[in-house]
Amino acid sequence: MKKNHSLLFLMFIAISKLAAQNDSANKISTMTFQNVKTESISVGGTEFYYRKLGAHNPGIPVIFLNHLAATMDNCDPRIMDGIAKEHQIICFDNRGVGATKGKTPETIAEMAIDARTFIHALGYEKVDLLGFSLGGFISQEILLQEPQLIRKAILTGTGPAGGEGIKNVTKITYIDIIRGLFSFKDAKTYLFFNRNENGKRSAKEFLNRLNERRENRDKKMKIVNLQRQLKAIHAWGLQAAQDLSIIKQPVLVANGDNDRMVPCSNTYDLSKRIANSEIIVYKDAGHGGIFQYNEQFVRSALSFLAK
């Protein structure tokens, strides 16, 4: 009788463990950017907030650095979920952005230092970078400041220091914010997409995706920190060119062919100045070309990261 009880007990334990493993696997398979939890880590008195997808994937994580005025809620879910199928991908609010308190730095170099501090706080010694727009500026600085930290980088909708038209981002941003107020549209409709049928449709789809997350949304960007970001971008546009030939890592650069914010000429410039680079230019697309062509971009990004 005791043996029977012991066998039943062992079977119960085994079944419980199996059920727990299945439950854990199901949670992983259903985890998307729509429902992934927001975490935080304290570094030097600053509490950095972040979201991590694809944590079950082995290998080097991808750190996503986003655009001007962007909190974690401005990450495109299709790109985040797409990359997370094969890699761990982490987005975060840098200092003064969204839920992360403090003053946003007024230089790209300082923003890069903050990003590196965050990456090291998570315990990573090697990462891949995916930077869009302002995030692409920051990614370049990280590559130059601490090259040993980076395995590969993807630079999208971005340009080098002193690049063509970058000094005009502040003016373009304010104009399109005003356009948005008068038309009752999100300014990204104008900033990121062409004003033809393809662009308008892509803008609507993109903005709808940004609203898929209903609970535990991020805090809004404060105007004063938006202004500080714009000051940093303006300074980047006026800055002397950097020596990008010292970047030895594989780099993928991508943009739309009609980018009003960071003209596509900067994309070609990056690809020429970074020796080990590949380039993708999306036709009939603006600054948000990777959002308009999100499926194609994810395929290209995964292929690049897998090489």
Which residues are covered by each model-predicted region?
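Flexible "cap/lid" loop of the alpha/beta hydrolase fold
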Residues: L144, K152-F182
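Short beta-strand/loop motif that positions the catalytic acidic residue
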Residues: I247, V253-N255, D259
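Active-site loop/oxyanion-hole signature of alpha/beta-hydrolase fold enzymes
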Residues: N94-L130
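Conserved alpha/beta-hydrolase "acid-adjacent" motif
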Residues: R260-N266
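Conserved alpha/beta-hydrolase catalytic His-Asp/Glu region
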Residues: D186-L230, H234-L238, D243
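Catalytic histidine-centered segment of alpha/beta-hydrolase-like enzymes
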Residues: A285-V298
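Short glycine-enriched nucleophile-adjacent loop
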Residues: G136-P147, A153
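Conserved HGGG/HGGXW glycine-rich cap/lid loop of the alpha/beta-hydrolase fold
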Residues: T46-K101
